């Protein structure tokens, strides 16, 4: 309550899942039911998704799940995989990860959020039907953070270190 989201006038094509408990909305023209919840506090340490089950097995069922660590809705992937969802779209972890066997994926972030976001960034393209799920990571980010291993000897000067680092960065691709 009192959130910016409460007072914002959303476009007609936006469906806001604003309850602190899991709710669902049916989209009949897509034969799809989408489930999710909203955070009403900074941290949620309860495993909110452990006992969720689909209520329309005849439709495509998608869970939008934010969390995955001990302070932000711990996620038990095995329990979630047995809940009957055709796809679980996960968020909170910045690194993209696809687990087609479990029918779930972390989208990650389109661009690195900070220097700890090492590796490629992009989005997940997917096709969902009652027959199956196909997911593909699509690189999108303009920039990428990479770790570079670099040995500094006690005799190296600042200028030598600088030049060696510049050369290493150029070898990796200086547009990143």
Regions found by a protein language model. Give the residues of each.
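His/Asp/Glu-rich metal-coordinating catalytic cores
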Residues: 1-127
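Binuclear metal-dependent phosphoesterase catalytic core
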Residues: 21-30, 107-171
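Short, glycine-/small-residue-enriched flexible loop/hinge segments at domain edges that mediate gating
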Residues: 175-176
């Amino acid at each position: 309550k009192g959130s910016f989201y409460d007072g914002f006038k959303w476009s007609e094509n936006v469906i806001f899942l604003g309850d602190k408990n899991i709710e669902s909305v049916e989209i009949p023209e897509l034969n799809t039911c989408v489930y999710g919840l909203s955070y009403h506090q900074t941290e949620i340490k309860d495993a909110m998704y452990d006992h969720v089950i689909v209520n329309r097995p005849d439709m495509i069922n998608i869970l939008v799940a934010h969390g995955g660590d001990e302070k932000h809705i711990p996620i038990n992937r095995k329990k979630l995989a047995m809940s009957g969802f055709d796809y679980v779209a996960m968020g909170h972890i910045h690194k993209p990860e696809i687990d087609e066997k479990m029918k779930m994926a972390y989208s990650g972030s389109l661009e690195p959020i900070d220097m700890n976001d090492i590796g490629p960034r992009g989005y997940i393209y997917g096709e969902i039907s009652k027959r199956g799920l196909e997911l593909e990571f699509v690189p999108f980010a303009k920039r990428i953070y990479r770790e570079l291993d670099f040995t500094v000897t006690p005799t190296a000067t600042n200028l030598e270190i600088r030049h060696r680092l510049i050369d290493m960065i150029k070898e990796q691709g200086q547009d990143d």
